[in-house]
Amino acid sequence: MKKYILALLICCFSLSAFTQNVNLSNSPYWDGECYLAVNPKNPMHMVSAWMYFSTSNLKNSMATRTSFDGGKTWSALQQLPHLYSTFTSADPTMYFGKDSCVYLAYIDLSGLKSSDSGYIMVTRSVNGGVTWKTPVKAISYKAQPNLPIDRPWIAADASNGPYSGRVYLTSQNAYFTPQPHYPWITYSSDSGATWSPIKRLDDSIPSGTITDATAFTTISANGTLYAAYVSYYTKYSLYPRLVIIKSSNGGNTFTPYIAITYGSSDAMPVADSLTKAGLCIASNPADTTNLVIVTTTNHFGEPDILTYNSHNAGKTWSGPVRVNDDQMGANDTIHDLSWGSFAPNGTYAVTWRDRRNTGKSDTVPFQIYAAISKDGGNTYSSNFLISDAISPAVTIVHGDDFLGCGLSDSAVYSLWSDMRTGKENTFFNATSISKIITAVPIITDNQSVKVDFYPNPFHDQTNIMIHTSLPMQNTTMQVYSMDGKKVDELPIGEGVMHTITINSLARGTYIWSLVQGEKTLARGKWVIE
């Protein structure tokens, strides 16, 4: 006899992701703002980095751990040294270069709001991130006025082109310094040992009055460098725009394109001051003409995860495409903190911070969700859950702005920080892509009702999330075999979240219907493995 256990979870609940979340930092202190780099030549090999509170000097340092088996096991934690014992570190960024050499850049400075001294440091590892070379100064706080050492991004040319092995580093002026602020770039042709003088990326289309002039970077498989920054320069446009800078000659000259012209509908609500709306640009290793940008804007009436894509090497862009598939305009449901990446075969994934199940505003708890695209960012899969616990809100206004996303051809890798332990710690998850692409879409017959199942397919347990403002009295979940026989009928009570555990049921596909009285509200399929 089949046995179902139906539990209503009201205030505090957890979900089962496809694989268990792994706490990489395991710290009783604050650990946040992480980055994940996956080796494109061996996607089972990845390196994680994050800001780690060090008890040796009571400052933040850079911490790294490495996995060579797809995240099943990790090396011991490594801490990068400071220039001086009084310094603190922030803003990790990594990139795999030629011969699987991995580069790590970060800020090391006298204080997070200090104008005293600081540098963007670069180190590299020739053994996959197990150990690191002595970090070198790439950009000095004195290289240009107003501290041009904020929010670095690093990228390395791993192609077989004429600039193979060149490493690029971008930065911006510190947000708290006087305007103007610019995106800056430098490069190294000797594996990061020495660096060229920094120069402005925005010499053709100025960043204007933008405070955060960050230049996000990627390099295509043919060695073309792309950088994306926001410009609000009213002499050229009355609207803010996202500028894409392209260089095919090693960063010597740049060609600008406009990817996004932002309108008033894109502006983030003033009340949502904790929303992290940074962006990411990624190039498709299987198609050098395909790039995808992911960001957060208010375009569809609330902060959503949106992507824009190019299929002609950055010349023109399509979008926005809404990635999160919860109900549109659902009362200030805020999704943010996104990152995207490609697998070697061209599959694209986005990971983000999601609040569809936890309430309104940017101060409510959150979960981590993801979605994949098999067509270069034109369309996306159903969203799937990454985190297996709900985290209390992170209330840091400045900083803690990014998480990590990487892929192999068979798995999505996610790295993020949350507060489930009471202190912000850094977590990792690997989710099999086969579990995602075989999931069956849900048909909604009543537009005021949305039903999600995670995971699906599943083995012995799945989670039902019912999003609706309708009362759920006299509602049941009717389950049918594929030959049309009703095999069970489960009562559904009030509340968003329900968990079903199946002790005995044959593998196969089953049809379910959410029924209220004589009306079918939603229907779909379960795949039991």
Language-model features, listed with the residues they occupy:
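Small side chains
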Residues: S14, T217, A227-A228, G340, ...
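Short, solvent-exposed secondary-structure boundary motifs
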Residues: S27, A439-N446
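C-terminal outer-membrane/trafficking sorting elements
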Residues: Y4-L6, T444-Y454, F458-E529
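Bacterial Sec-dependent N-terminal signal peptides
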Residues: M1-Q20, V440
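Compositionally biased non-globular segments, especially hydrophobic aliphatic-rich helices
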Residues: I10, T86-T88, D354, M465, ...
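Short glycine/proline-enriched turn or capping motifs at secondary-structure junctions
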Residues: K3, M419-F427, G517-L521
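Extracellular, repeat-based ectodomains that mediate carbohydrate processing or recognition
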Residues: T19-I437
